[in-house]
Amino acid sequence: EIKEDLLGKKTGRVIYRDNLTVFQTSGGECRFINFLGMDWHYAVSSQEGVNQYHVWFVPEVAEMLDQDTVYLAAFSLEKQAIKDHSMILHSAYMCYEDTAVLFSAPSETGKSTQAGLWEKYRGTWTVNGDRSLLIREEDGWYANGWPVCGSSEICNNKSYPVRAIVMLSQAKENRISRLKGLEALRKVMEQITINAWNSEFQIQAMDELEILLKEVPVYHLECDISEDAVRCLEDVLAGGRGEE
């Protein structure tokens, strides 16, 4: 009944993704959300006004709200965050010398592994193993905790100024280079939660990313899982520039 009622209010085209159906109503955006490979929806999110949403879940997912894919998609939090100059970055968020170092990469690359190496060899600690909320304040960018953390089970509510974003890739030898311009923009943007179907959102995200990249260095760390990977990044954080 809910689905039929909302579909009756749709305006404009319907956008279909592998796990998401999105369309506009008079109140704003409406989402039908399903798991990949499933043809039934586990949640419906309907925007009724600027800051008002109605969300319905099927009972079977009531215990899954600690999973980011469920939590984030249903509550449309990235849409609210961008209005406050904030973005959600897929990253392992490490506290190092009271600053935030963010390891970012596609899933299964080794973000939490690298953060774990720093804990083991340098005594740092991980704030969140899978997400960070980047907020632009008057004095710069800050990384903040996020309510859920994927499979890492590391989830703390702490805020530190962002020292660096480190894009990871697996390699047999450790080396680091500074990313700039379009390359840095593309790499970071791939790991930001973005509504690809919403042109206004994309423009806002691009504007925020341009500001971020002017203020925060982005590195590409090709690494293994040894202490040498830690040293490689540590040298740059201590004042080195990395390979240009």
Task: Briefly describe each language-model feature range.
Residues 109-111:
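Conserved glycine(s) of the Walker
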Residues 1-102, 107, 117-125, 132-244:
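A noncatalytic interaction/capping subdomain that flanks phosphate/NTP-handling catalytic cores
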Residues 114:
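Hydrophobic positions on the alpha1 helix immediately C-terminal to the Walker A/P-loop
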